Amino acid sequence: MRTYVVGGAVRDALLGLPVKDRDWVVVGATPDEMLARGFRPVGKDFPVFLHPQTQEEHALARTERKTGRGYAGFAFHTAPDVTLEEDLARRDLTINAIARDADGTLIDPYGGVADLHGRVFRHVSPAFAEDPVRILRVARFAARFADFSVAPETLALMRAMVDNGEVDHLVAERVWQEFARGLMEAHPARMIRVLRDCGALARLLPELDRLFGVPQPAQHHPEIDTGEHVLMVVEQAAARAHSLPVRWATLLHDLGKGETPAAILPHHYGHEARSADLARQVSERLKAPVDCRDLAVMVAREHGILAQAAVLRAETMVKVLERCDALRRPERFALMLEAAACDHLGRGGERPENWAPAAQWQAALAAVRSVEAGAIARACADKAQVPQRIHAARVAAVKALRAHPPPAEGIS
């Protein structure tokens, strides 16, 4: 029985990156032998065991055979005579098909070390095309390793996989899982670019794909292209280390611009309402978590008016705060402001160092929350008038704030 560290642990160590988890391949063993050594079985589809001391995963060397469409149609074969090279051959990219033995010697039958040095994502074998999830994985790796490029032959294979309908068999949960992981990488825009380059974005997220090439007014968007603007906004969210809900919201905030009538371009009147509807549809189709869905819908609907805090009437500001449930959910409203700030900062040309509307909205929210709704309700004889009285008091509080505004700070 021989054991080897494989995959991401070897790759990251060679790149000088921290190694969080180690996966092992075991050659020359049977499940019974693993059990006799105290390993605990955890694999459902193929033999995977946890080491009795380290709890690290040890998988018996195996080969794979395609049996159907999509990512689930595989048959696995494990036996003591399956070699390490055969196990590595089933992996997606050469940089993930490197093993290290107990002495530290690298086993690299497919040129992964050379591709690490060349900063290239290259598929190990034509079997790459058997699993459409690999398209999403390559795109996610592009978001993590920003200085890598996809080998031309690998990109061509990915395009062929899209053309033959393999990606259409991906289940929503798996698409969301890979999208979410990619969005949380350092450069999520690169994930979107790779998916677009191979044609997968048009199949998986057509609402986003159609934004590319749609013009916007140069006065507000020097970058012109709506798709490019969205990627700049997502990059702003990543640069500020925002949470997944904020990053998802920035990705979907302008979807409605893809449905703007051509006759009114480059203007996009009413795109916020269209964007909110599409953000909900996309989030539900991909089965995104509720917090991601709700924030995306609200940011899409409100990002335009949030940017206008300086010119809004007190009445309008209070209506927005009430509509966003900001009094009960101030933390979520703060996330909306963060996403709206990314929208403002994620564009071409010169940008101010901070986004002033954030401080204006937070000050207005504080003023509204200072209104004692309970006291107003107790003092009002006509209970039917209580909501209007409370609303009027909130408007008065914001008007008073406008008369003596706090120092402008904003989100930098």
From Swiss-Prot:
The keyword Transmembrane does not apply. Magnesium is required for nucleotidyltransferase activity. Nickel for phosphatase activity. Its EC number is 2.7.7.72, 3.1.3.-, 3.1.4.-. CTP binds at G8, R11, R91, R137, R140. GO terms for biological process: RNA repair; tRNA 3'-terminal CCA addition. Keywords: ATP-binding, Hydrolase, Magnesium, Metal-binding, Multifunctional enzyme, Nickel, Nucleotide-binding, Nucleotidyltransferase, RNA repair, RNA-binding, Transferase, tRNA processing. The keyword Nucleotidyltransferase applies. Its cofactor is Mg(2+); Ni(2+). Mg(2+) binds at D21, D23. It catalyses: a tRNA precursor + 2 CTP + ATP = a tRNA with a 3' CCA end + 3 diphosphate; a tRNA with a 3' CCA end + 2 CTP + ATP = a tRNA with a 3' CCACCA end + 3 diphosphate. GO terms for molecular function: ATP binding; CCA tRNA nucleotidyltransferase activity; cyclic-nucleotide phosphodiesterase activity; magnesium ion binding; phosphatase activity; tRNA binding. Monomer. Can also form homodimers and oligomers. A single active site specifically recognizes both ATP and CTP and is responsible for their addition. Comprises two domains: an N-terminal domain containing the nucleotidyltransferase activity and a C-terminal HD domain associated with both phosphodiesterase and phosphatase activities. This is Multifunctional CCA protein.
